[in-house]
Structures are given as structure tokens and as C-alpha cells.
């Protein structure tokens, strides 16, 4: 399973890259706005920081506007992936862009049939939103299971990129399901490192070593 970081914060990306555990980055207009950075410059900076796919989202909602923005964004770096909303106009744009060799990530996917349409159009990735589905009393993990099964049944090459990850249990369940990629906020990634028994074990080892050091005069 590949791990992407869902952020536009360069310091967070640098820390995660240094850990050696992330394979790409996803952004959206909200994350970019939060950083108060020029959009294209920040995307280029992210591409220079992580050597993997970097999703950058269009803001146009019409076919012509999305295709134009996508072509411009794709010119920024070979690793840029264009995030396109799950709408009829968006799927039409995905079909055009995929025929041009431009990688796409269909975002705001909340049903398996939406994911099916995205795959039919040639999307490189589909992003089902786990946490947001859970918020309306549905089962976000079941959604991913259905998408993974459908793609396997019909041999689609589209990658399932699970998004809207709220906590480490989401990551565990998605890994068990066999999802291709999980993109998560930095705070969730940090939590994956920690377990209370690990912390207690380290504390005990250090205490035992200190007692040994005192007893031997080291």
C-alpha cells in the first residue's frame, strides 16, 4: 500500500519525506488557501520536495475550463496529477485528458458507481472520501471494498486512493481491504508511529540501562 500525505504545508512534507514513508502528496484548494501561498509556485515547490505523484485540483466546473486548467497544471512538472470533481463535466474532461496522457484523480467520490464511471473514463486514480461517508451514517470502508471488488472484477487499471482519513483505524482497515493508496493528514501519519506499549518499552529499556550503567560505573 502506498501512502500519500494530504497537505500543502512544505514543512510537513519535508518531515514525512525524511521519515522515508510517503510516496506522494494530495492537495486541494482549501489546503492551498490555508498556506496563503501562490498556487502554481506551491505545487512546483511540493514537486521539488517529494519524488512522487502530486495531485493539484482544478477550480473550474465546466468542461472547457477544467481541460484548460489541467493542461496548464500538467506543464508544471511531470509528477503533477490533475484532481477533477466527480461531475458529468468532470468525467468528460477526464476522458479527454486521459487520451492526452495527462494523469487524473477523480475526487469527491461517494459511491461505487461514481468510481465505476471514473474508471470507464480512464482516470488514473479515484478518491473515495471515507470519513465524509461515515459522517452521514454510511459505511466508508464498505464503499472502498465495493470499489476494489468492481475494479478487480473488470480489470480496471485505475488506482483506488482512499481519502478523508480521520484516524489510524481507518488506515489499518484500508490496508486490510487491500486499497492501493491512502492519503492522510500529517497528524494521522504521526499517530501511526505511536503505541502506548512501545513508549513503555522504551522507558523500561532506558531505566534498565541507567541502572546497569550506575552499577558497572560505565
Curated annotation (Swiss-Prot):
GO function term, MF aspect, one: transaldolase activity
A single Gene Ontology CC term: cytoplasm
Pathway: Carbohydrate degradation; pentose phosphate pathway; D-glyceraldehyde 3-phosphate and beta-D-fructose 6-phosphate from D-ribose 5-phosphate and D-xylulose 5-phosphate (non-oxidative stage): step 2/3
EC identifiers of the protein: 2.2.1.2
Family annotation (SUPFAM superfamilies): Aldolase
Active-site residues, record numbering mapped to chain: 83 (schiff-base intermediate with substrate)
Keyword Calcium: no
Compartmental location: Cytoplasm
Coiled coil: none
Alphabetical GO biological process terms: carbohydrate metabolic process; pentose-phosphate shunt
One family name in Pfam for this protein: TAL_FSA
InterPro entries referenced in this protein's UniProt entry, alphabetically: Aldolase_TIM (IPR013785), TAL/FSA (IPR001585), Transaldolase_3B (IPR022999), Transaldolase_3B/F6P_aldolase (IPR004731), Transaldolase_AS (IPR018225), TSA/FSA_arc/bac (IPR033919)
PROSITE patterns per record: TRANSALDOLASE_1 (PS01054), TRANSALDOLASE_2 (PS00958)
Record's catalysed reaction(s): D-sedoheptulose 7-phosphate + D-glyceraldehyde 3-phosphate = D-erythrose 4-phosphate + beta-D-fructose 6-phosphate
Keywords: Cytoplasm, Pentose shunt, Schiff base, Transferase
UniProt KW NADP keyword: no
Listed HAMAP family: Transaldolase_3b (MF_00494)
Job description of the protein: Transaldolase is important for the balance of metabolites in the pentose-phosphate pathway.
Family (UniProt): Belongs to the transaldolase family. Type 3B subfamily.
Full protein name: Probable transaldolase
